Design a protein with these regions (language model features):
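Short glycine-rich substrate-engagement loop in P-loop NTPases that contacts/grips substrate
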Residues: 311-334
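The Walker A (P-loop) glycine that initiates the GxxxxGKT/S ATP-binding motif of P-loop NTPases
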Residues: 259, 322, 344
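Conserved P-loop NTPase mechanochemical-coupling segment
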Residues: 296-299, 303-314
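Walker A/P-loop
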Residues: 257-296
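Conserved AAA+/SF3 P-loop NTPase catalytic/coupling segment centered on the Walker-B
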Residues: 329-353
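Peripheral, non-AAA+ core regions of ATP-driven protein-machinery
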Residues: 3-7, 18, 22, 26-256, ...
């Protein structure tokens, strides 16, 4: 113990001050745990690790590892959600590390693995099971697991590591089932995720089958939706233009449509995806992974038709080509394996037309 001098109201007072190291039990604790997660940087996915250490000391919650604001905000989301399931954060020093530290971590997909690794450090779930588990998902204030973008691309990267089990939001289960015969479990809440981790191998398999059956029953009506692409055979007239379109589609050539307004140029362009060859399973995976990374994958199911992208002629270079500090796909990328239609091209600025002048349909 040492003494410090404080001046209060003009009077000198000697106050005792205790060094933290003098308190018993302040030595470093052994509550350490690790889990596997997935991250997305542009269209590139990678496998990440989330580590937590809970030790004695002043209560704090530190998150390190080159994190974006979306990841740092998980601190408050998890504080409330863990309290909702009667697993409040301990009044100790909590340090969470996200590796690899050289890659910017963005998005909300790290919420679920962070919550699970904290629960394991508190003894709520077996820590040894998390080392063979891969998890992504956003955690709400009410402990519900919400949909995240890029699950399809992240699962492709995680599949190379051959983890024992994969934990994703239930709303993303369609993307997980499309990757292949992976042991993917879709969960709706943090309690369900804890139940799955604590269950035996046979019980986990039963829970995965039940989740798949629930998703299939909900997605049955959504998968039987009408085609979006207009039928090329319903176009009347314009025989020369239709022949030019068929030649361009057969050879994947560029096509320039010129003519007065109202002659059917836009309708002809919208029908082009319908006469292109059907996408293979590999192409469906590619296109769906791009739209999943962009957060535009509808209903969590694979895209079956070739995309048709028609940006406005006033679109910016950033929106057209993509990019940014945290790269995001642009219109050109969204038209992968499909048709990019530049309407009113004469009104577009030259810096918009130049990046796309060598693109084929």
């Amino acid at each position: 113990m040492v003494k410090t001098v404080m001046i209060v109201g003009g009077q000198r007072k000697s106050l005792p001050f205790f060094w933290l190291a003098e308190f018993p039990g302040t030595e470093r604790g052994k509550m350490y745990c690790q889990i596997n997660a997935g991250g997305l940087y542009g269209l590139q996915s990678y496998v990440a690790q989330v580590e937590v250490d809970i030790s004695k000391g002043l209560p704090c919650f530190d998150m390190v590892g080159l994190l974006d604001s979306e990841v740092r905000e998980a601190r408050e989301r998890l504080r409330v959600s863990l309290h909702h399931i009667n697993a409040a954060l301990p009044a100790e020093k909590i340090t969470v590390n996200y590796s690899p530290a050289g890659i910017v971590k963005s998005g909300t997909s790290f919420d679920l693995p962070t919550a699970l690794v904290i629960l394991a450090a508190q003894g709520k779930v077996p820590p040894e099971r998390l080392r063979e588990l891969w998890a992504v998902g956003e955690v709400g204030l009410d402990a519900r697991i919400k949909q995240v973008r890029g699950v399809l691309a992240m699962l492709h990267a995680a599949n190379q590591s051959a983890f024992r089990s994969y934990l994703i939001p239930f709303e993303n289960l369609g993307e997980g089932l499309a990757v292949g015969k992976l042991p993917v479990m879709g969960v709706c809440s943090l309690e369900e995720a804890m139940e799955y981790v604590n269950a035996s191998a046979q019980e986990q398999e039963r829970m995965r089958r039940d989740a798949e059956d629930r998703w299939q029953s909900q997605a049955k009506g959504r998968m039987e939706k009408e085609k979006k692409t207009p039928d090329f055979a319903l176009l009347c007239g314009m025989e020369e233009a239709k022949r030019a379109a068929m030649i361009a589609a057969a050879g994947a050539h560029n096509l320039l449509l010129a003519g007065p307004p109202g002659t059917g140029k836009t309708m002809l362009a919208r029908c082009l995806p319908g006469i292109l060859p059907p996408m293979s399973e590999e192409e469906k995976q590619e296109v769906s992974a791009i739209y999943s990374a962009a957060g535009q994958l509808e209903d969590g199911t694979l895209i079956q038709e070739r995309p048709f992208v028609s940006p406005h002629h006033t679109v910016s270079v950033y929106a057209m080509t993509g990019g940014g500090a945290v790269p995001k796909p642009g219109m050109v990328t969204l038209a992968h394996r499909g048709v990019l239609f530049l309407d009113e091209m004469a009104l577009s600025l030259i810096h918009i037309s130049e990046p796309t002048r060598l693109l084929s349909i």
